[in-house]
Amino acid sequence: MPLSASEGLCVLVADDEAPARQRIIDLLRRDSQVGAIIEASDGLSAVEIIQNRRPDLVFLDVQMPERTGLEVIAEVGAERMPLTVFVTAYDEHAIRAFEANALD
């Protein structure tokens, strides 16, 4: 369940590459509005965390093992998905994310 405003935002960082996850986490730790940071290293773990913990914000790698970022959204359901920031180094993945209703 999302944290109350007094506890700060609960943020999920889902990326299969540990250095990429750590860079995002380091940036989030500087923000006083962020309370809890949860990590996932694959898409299946991301789905389970989203369904069970209901984070307020998700940083989601497009290309991960077990489930891609787009498959995570499809499995959770776009209407139940928290605000999501797609993380990708590939233009092709960004295009597919926008086709899945991601915002620029």
Model-predicted segments: where are they?
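Basic, polyanion-interacting recognition surfaces, primarily
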Residues: 1-2, 19
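Short, flexible hinge/linker loops that cap or flank conserved catalytic cores
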Residues: 3-6, 78
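Switch/coupling loops of ABC transporter nucleotide-binding domains
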Residues: 9, 35, 82
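Conserved beta-strand positions in the Rossmann-like core of class I SAM-dependent methyltransferases
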Residues: 12, 37-38
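Acidic, metal-coordinating helix/loop segments flanking the phosphotransfer/catalytic sites
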Residues: 25, 29-31, 39-57
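Short helix-capping segments at alpha-helix termini
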Residues: 29-33, 79-80
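CheY-like receiver
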Residues: 47-104
